[in-house]
Amino acid sequence: MVPSKANEDFLIANAHAKINLHLEVLGIRSDGFHELAMVMQSINLSDQLKMIKRVDNTINLKSNNKEISNGDDNLIIKAAKLLRNKVENQELGVDIELEKNIPIGAGLAGGSTDAAATLLGLNKLWKLNLKIDELENLSKEIGSDIPFCISGGRQICFGRGEILEKLKFDQIQLGLVLVKDPSIQVSTPVAYKKYKEQFGESYLEDDRDFEIKRNSIRSIDWSDQSLFDNRKEIQNDLQKSIRPMTPEVEKSLNLLSSLPDSRLVSMSGSGPSCFALFQNYDQANKVLKEHVNEFERAGLSAWACSMMSNGVELRNEFT
């Protein structure tokens, strides 16, 4: 799919996965969705989307993963059509080739980050000149995690995850070992349903109470590296429901907790992916290499990752 030379009708987007450094379920909103308080972080485990501009109204998608639909139910297709409808130019089209590296159904926002990359990439490829906040607002129509994935980095996320408060600091030094059992996926709606069944009686019911909890999250210095040694400050509420009912998550968390020098160990999102934080990427990579046989025996896919300050990277150069 790569043209003979770089040109303005071709673009590559690297779409970064995310982890949840914090996830609290506060209660039920008036629209029936859960009210959440989260801290999300982009990591360098990435999908790659190659895009070639068309001018014949055609939007094509192909992928290296046969599990990926190339129809209208795919978030990439939804994002492309949403953007085209927004600018009211039905002649716009694109060929997209997806290299899928982020595991599916893993709590890593793999589909959402692909949609974010599509919006950012086509905004540039189609020369639409929409601002980031316009793309974030537009993306809320098709997914709660997509607004975060557009700008990425480390952000506090409220509402369904679409209300963003970006955190700014000089360096994101932490590394992580990320694991997932490739034999399972966890349905996000099922995870929230299960949590509501078990803990719904403790839900907050008033927006004033929601705001008190939001302010509590805001008051934490999320750039403080030592914060991630204090397990009382960090939580993933969904882990309380998913861990007991999912042996693969239990296995993952136990193995990660046994690694030397690991700091916070947690499930990401609704799972089943889990991670252990380390002082930096080099330490995480060293530990992964030293324990790779243990992960293989446990049937876990494993990655050493660094944290990213953005959600998507665009370029039109190629090798």
From Swiss-Prot:
Its EC number is 2.7.1.148. Gene3D superfamilies: 3.30.230.10, GHMP kinase, C-terminal domain. The active site is at K18, D145. ATP binds at P103, I104, G105, A106, G107, L108, A109, G110, G111, S112, T113. It comes from the Bacteria. The keyword Transcription regulation does not apply. One of its GO terms (biological process) is isopentenyl diphosphate biosynthetic process, methylerythritol 4-phosphate pathway. Pathway: Isoprenoid biosynthesis; isopentenyl diphosphate biosynthesis via DXP pathway; isopentenyl diphosphate from 1-deoxy-D-xylulose 5-phosphate: step 3/6. Keywords: ATP-binding, Isoprene biosynthesis, Kinase, Nucleotide-binding, Transferase. It is an enzyme of class 2 (transferase). SUPFAM superfamilies: GHMP Kinase, C-terminal domain, Ribosomal protein S5 domain 2-like. One of its GO terms (molecular function) is 4-(cytidine 5'-diphospho)-2-C-methyl-D-erythritol kinase activity. Disulfide bonds: none annotated. The keyword Transferase applies. It catalyses: 4-CDP-2-C-methyl-D-erythritol + ATP = 4-CDP-2-C-methyl-D-erythritol 2-phosphate + ADP + H(+). HAMAP family: IspE (MF_00061). Belongs to the GHMP kinase family. IspE subfamily. NCBIfam families: ispE, PRK14608.1. Catalyzes the phosphorylation of the position 2 hydroxy group of 4-diphosphocytidyl-2C-methyl-D-erythritol. This is 4-diphosphocytidyl-2-C-methyl-D-erythritol kinase.
